[in-house]
């Protein structure tokens, strides 16, 4: 059984409850009823009960829009979409702004690629003026997001990408260095020829910038790379999208190209594609120090069916989005609480033993999810554009077990792609304050600073699992916080997980503030070919902006393991155990 308490309950009431009086069990019934309505009448009650069981027990937690909008009129249940990249015209500019506004007003984040836009200074047929360029259109879209943010319940979330070969790439790389520019968007460089780019960087070669074969010029690859590294080191942006790997791994390589990712980068998408997200709470499957793989497999199968049903009952912001979802039926089944799971099993996050377990777990989840989708194809039909023989030719499918590939070739598959790893920040707080996604725990303990009226206060907070272990007298020596891991530890975990995920992985590579930029650059270049997307964050490079727009110290300060153990024992002696809830809501995790 599960019932949110403390800060988890606050998140549920503030973010997801239908009314202030709605209970957790009532919300689970509401969601289960909505999603089971996609089933045939004879099966609806059966699957409503099954969905309720995995929701109410906190085995499976769907994306936030599913929690919030299920049961409402014309529910929009999907977290994110990607917009049309074709925008090199007056109509294209207008359509881009309109699509972003309409989608954002339903609560959907938007990914948008601008590589189709002619570069700054290019000629425009029939006009005397020169083209304003891709970055200028980004500024327009970002400006349109401000009133949507002010008028809605959620902050607008955008991803802007530009191809590495676009003539405006240098302007793009520096666009967010100006205060107040592109404040609603994450930005990422998209590279379709990553291996060639890496080779050019190492050999001090050049790459050609061009737009549709025009406006060609050459630039040293090292100049672009150094700018990417420097800006990411100092401001956590841009990210780098290895589109060569994305396309190589894509199961729909025979249908259409992918264009960019959703705002957090966990799903590379085709034009008008969507993120249909749900997460398995891994720590709930640890029983007597082992994973209950039978129960996990059952939940994976129900999770795939649940998310496939979401596509059937969803009300899409734009008709093109519905058409794309109907034709491809892409879903994003992921996990959360990986770090907690490792701790429960006695593994240190980033250790060799822990990584072997992650690899084994990834193989199990991917196989179970794909075979569940094949069973759905037998029952409900494969996705309409499925060509089973071509489907198994993708880079990802070639790594699947022979039996799984044979099943796909024989029956087709219900969902074109199935797996992802999303950040899961808020829904992880909802799920017992568990560790978020595949990230390490922030710290075994930390100080949280917050405002109470005009008074700045601080409280000591222990990670719930750390507190449980300490209270029970168990060893916590394998607990490790994000800041105590090496950069290679972070990258290696992401590399292992990416091999078992057909969509992509959203992970932040954390670095200490004094970490050498030269070391970051070498490791990034080493791991770049194996990761679809990378985002680095150096501690305190962005600061923390409070409600008055002022910069102050971040609200969370990590405490070392030894210090956490000492302060936990002291708090027990004095009867002042650290609070595990956030009274202010400032927590950004």
Tell me what each language-model feature is.
Residues 32-39, 52-126, 134-137, 148-151, ...:
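Function-dense linear segments that define catalytic or interfacial modules
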Residues 1-77, 84, 225-227, 515, ...:
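Acidic/polar, glycine-rich intrinsically disordered N-terminal extensions of enzymes
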Residues 3-6, 265-268, 307-312, 393-398, ...:
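Catalytic alpha/beta core of large soluble enzyme barrels
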Residues 42-47, 109-112, 152-159, 242, ...:
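Flexible, glycine/charged-enriched surface loops at secondary-structure junctions
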Residues 97, 213, 299-322, 347-424, ...:
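Internal maturation/activation junctions in enzymes
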Residues 19-22, 42, 66-73, 84-91, ...:
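Alpha-helix capping and helix-loop boundary segments enriched in small/acidic/polar residues
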Residues 35-83, 91, 208-217, 221-231, ...:
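Gly/Pro-rich turn-and-neighbor structural signature
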